[in-house]
Structures are given as C-alpha cells and as structure tokens.
Amino acid sequence: MLARRWSTVVCALALVAAFLVAGAFYAAGAAGLIAVEKDEPAYLSFFSDDRVHELEISVEDWDAFLAVAPEERYVRADVTLDGHTVRGVGLRAKGNNSRRLVEQAGHVRYGLKIEFDHYEEGLSYLGLDKLSLDASFQDNSYLKTYVALDMMAFMGVPTPEASFVQVSVNGQAWGLYLAVEDPEDAFAERLFGDGHGMLYKPDYRRLSDENADVALRYVGEDPARYDNILRTARFDLAAGDAEELIGALRTLSSGENIDEVVD
C-alpha cells in the first residue's frame, strides 16, 4: 500500500487538475467556445445515472496488452456498451502519474482509453468519438472525480458526462469504472455546436518546470511560453489561435473586463 502522505498528494492533485481543466474551459470562451442549445446526442444514454452500465471489451491477447500498457500503445479491440457493439476501436491504458502509481503498487487494473475512430475514420459509438475509463485508483469511494465533475456542471462549466460502468474483458469481470466523455470532437459539438472554437487540455512536460501556463497565468506575448497549452490543443491550431489564447490570459491576469473572455 502506498504511504498515506502520497495518497493525499495524489487526491489533491486530482482535484486541482479538475479545476484547472475547468479554468481552461472558461479561458476557451475567448476562442469562440460559447455554449449552445442543441439536440442531445444518442450516446448520452450511456451516461444516465439511473443504473450502473455495462461495457464489454474483446481483445485478441489481453496479457500482451497489459505488457505494453505502460507505453500507452493502442491495440485493436471490439467493445459492447449496453448491448451496442462497435468493432475495431483503439484501446490503450491511460494516465500519467496515476498510471505510474498503479505500476509501482504492482497492479494491472489501469485506467483505459477507448478511441472509436482510431483505426477507422468516422467510427463512433452513437456519435461519441472517445471515452475514458477511470479505475479510481486510491479512491475507494469512486466519487472524487464524479463529484468534481458534478460540481463543475453545477457552477455552469461545460462539463464532460460521466457514469459508473461494470467492465468485463473477454468474458471475465474486470471491475467497476467511471466512464467519462472525453473532451474532444463529440464533447465540443454537443456543448458548443458544429462551429465550435478551440479546446485545450493544459499538461506539463515535467513537474519540476515552472508550468505557469498550466496555471493559466499570463507570462508575456511569446507563444513558446504557452507550450503546455498550445501543445495539447484538441483540434488543429489555426492562424490567430495562439494570439487569441494569450489575449484571454492577459485579460484574466489584469482582472479587468473579465466578462470579455469568460462566458
């Protein structure tokens, strides 16, 4: 078992990360991400909170998948979500610090990422292009991420949907996970419409770096100072996107006219 001190640090970092992502969604308002009213996509049925959902994974060699899991390498798999099968999706282990902690603890029940269109362009689950499965490592309540997302939604932050799922692999039970709508194309289209703007997921290269951009701080006009944001853009960057982002952070830093960049 990991020391309680490190467990506390990991939990704190998870909550901080959730609110940094919330801050990123706010800053993205200046890039054209304004919430819109739109018909609900069919895949939202998988995120209903009236029951624990079911997700079955079929992969040719599960042991081989676990062996390369630390490399976060995609393998081909078939998945069935509440009886709806999608064949030939991309499956990999997910996580950064959380994945390494799983390995250090000697476990193999990794968080998972399912990219429906990884091998076949346009493939989806009822319109959903990417799904994360949170193993809730070191969270026996399974509630920290779920509650953080619920708080974000309550505060009016555009928030990924989430639900609890029982996962099985090749017919064998693999445990309870939290399924989370990945903030990519389907997420952006659901909340911001077909003409959505840019979406970022700030992430540092090294924890020892200053990482001021991850904290959404304005550090000058040089786009290179915002590598941890621009590098993680979920869509292809267009001309002017970097300048728009920097302008939003400049305004947030000044504390004036914040309503111009925060929806």
Regions found by a protein language model. Name each.
Residues 1-263:
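Phosphate/dinucleotide-binding and metal-coordinating scaffold of catalytic cores
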